[in-house]
């Protein structure tokens, strides 16, 4: 998947036609200019390791969580997430900032699901989002 990010950005930068997923990837990259130079490093970006001890945020994970939230909002799953996103966007005036606020509850829900071996608890996840 990492290579898809790099390829989408390369094609976007060259003004080439993008497939739908590539367009989504390029859009989220464009909203994170702090990652662009690093992504353009090519192989170094593909091979980079991100560990809690390293203290570096994983750009691929961060952008992937943006994409996950966008998909959840588009499908309103869990039911009510589109309203939460709309309210957060209204308060901040910025949909991207709303997504940043929503990332931590999503990451927590995914971590808990992985740890328990169960699907994410959508009700608990939505409750966390509603408290933002």
Question: Can you say where each PLM-predicted feature lies in the sequence?
Answer:
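Sequence termini and other peripheral, non-core segments
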Residues: 86, 91, 95-99, 131
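Non-catalytic, well-ordered alpha-helical scaffold segments
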Residues: 3, 19-23, 62-67, 82, ...
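Aromatic-anchored, charged helix-turn/loop surface patch used as a conserved interaction hotspot
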Residues: 21-90
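Glycine-rich, aromatic-bearing surface loops/beta-hairpins
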Residues: 115, 119-132
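Amphipathic alpha-helical core segments of compact helical bundles
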Residues: 66, 70, 74, 89, ...
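Charge-rich, solvent-exposed alpha-helical interaction surfaces
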Residues: 4, 84-87, 128
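Intrinsically disordered or highly flexible coil/loop and linker segments, enriched in small
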Residues: 14, 18, 34-35, 78-79, ...
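N-terminal leader/targeting peptides and immediately adjacent processing regions
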Residues: 1-34
